[in-house]
Amino acid sequence: MELNLKMDRSKELFEESKKYLVGGVNSPVRSFKPFPFFVKSAKDCFLYDEDGNEFIDYCLAYGPMVLGHANENILNAVKSQMDLGTAYGVPSEKEITLAKEVINRIPCAEMVRFVNSGTEATMGAIRLARGVTGRDKIIKFEGAFHGAHDYVLVKTGSGALTHGAPNSPGIPEDTTKNTLLIPFNDEDAVRKVISENKDEIACIILEPVMGNVGCILPQDGYLQFLREITEENGILLIFDEVITGFRLSKGGAQEYFGIKSDLATIGKILGGGFPIGAITGKKEYMEQFSPSGQIYQAGTFNGNPVSVTAGIETLKNLDDKFYKETTKKADILSNFLRETAEKYNVSTKVYNVASIFQIYFNEKEVVTYEDAKSSDTEKFMRYFYTLLENGVFVAPSQFECCFTSIKHNDEVLEKTMNAIDIAMKKL
């Protein structure tokens, strides 16, 4: 695939990178053919590559950069903190400050344990659920991505699905024998698996909006159904809000949909561009973590002062006006995608919620993992390449989602819609 872009330096760097980094990248989602562009800098909603190309960014580092790249307030706060130290190994007051902010926003949050990534958060939350209930089995939905750890790398989405390995080799069958897989949005499947595994299931873990297989929305009443059936059966409900946390609303998906889970995992936006994750939930459960309880979770960089500082500064800016504006931008683009696809007679389904959106090249509604997999991925990549050639960057996969930030202004949206029109016309 030859792109109509000057990418000589990126090609050169990719060839060199392959000698030292596996596949030339440090995360599979960053890889696409013939080679990814290499970023030199980023500002607001733009990426600038090593060849001098400018791209409007709707990937936003896969979600965290809601305030745009290189936000001055965050940078200034972080620089001030770095003068005071970058890692302590003992508690600091800012950890309390950020924890209070999380608790004030997230409905289920009564206590917090900071970790270093979304993967660590979901791993810890599942361990906590098992420890609290004394049960081993977990329910996971097909296509949901809950990080790169063994218990959940089964029929997963994100880069694993994109690169053809939704069930990762290297994971013993014994490790996943207690992971029960069912389709999303299917109430009967939930009832059946709970009935067949009575008093053995510790938790149901889910992405309230499945953002790692595109953008699959919960059908009306589905999250409420999960809340009710878990309560009836002594099963903990875990919302994996690594994507939706602080993205859908101030209180994430719980506030947006009006459903309170037992535990929640958050990340991405929480760190304002720095590595962080968090497990949060009801006090009676959270206090079972060591040192107040016996369930062990630890990390050298847990509550890192630099990441925590960036998180505090980020959350300061996420008010009602912010959510209204970012949602409006995603609505505009989503509606334009629908209109333009119809204009050029391209079969698509477009889904959006708050500032998340994605297009599927599919004739049928996408409500499950299998629906998403039936989409025309080759057509999506042609759409992706045309957008890229016209200065717009979205995640290079049908099975990721797009995001708007506060920095996507009217001029940027106009340029984006022009690129979309060109891409749809070519299809």
UniProtKB/Swiss-Prot annotation:
Protein EC: 5.4.3.8
InterPro entries reported for this sequence: 4pyrrol_synth_GluAld_NH2Trfase (IPR004639), Aminotrans_3 (IPR005814), Aminotrans_3_PPA_site (IPR049704), PyrdxlP-dep_Trfase (IPR015424), PyrdxlP-dep_Trfase_major (IPR015421), PyrdxlP-dep_Trfase_small (IPR015422)
Catalysed conversion reaction: (S)-4-amino-5-oxopentanoate = 5-aminolevulinate
Keyword set includes Cytoplasm: yes
GO biological process: protoporphyrinogen IX biosynthetic process
Recorded metabolic or biological pathway in which this protein acts: Porphyrin-containing compound metabolism; protoporphyrin-IX biosynthesis; 5-aminolevulinate from L-glutamyl-tRNA(Glu): step 2/2
GO CC, alphabetical: cytoplasm
Annotated GO MF terms: glutamate-1-semialdehyde 2,1-aminomutase activity; pyridoxal phosphate binding; transaminase activity
Class of this enzyme: isomerase
Entry keyword set: Cytoplasm, Isomerase, Porphyrin biosynthesis, Pyridoxal phosphate
Entry cofactors: pyridoxal 5'-phosphate
Origin: domain of life: Archaea
CDD domains attached to this UniProt entry: OAT_like
Cell compartment(s), UniProt: Cytoplasm
Modification sites for N6-(pyridoxal phosphate)lysine: K268
NCBIfam families registered for this protein in UniProt: hemL, PRK00062.1
Family, similarity comment: Belongs to the class-III pyridoxal-phosphate-dependent aminotransferase family. HemL subfamily.
Name of the protein described by the UniProt record: Glutamate-1-semialdehyde 2,1-aminomutase
Gene expressing this chain: hemL
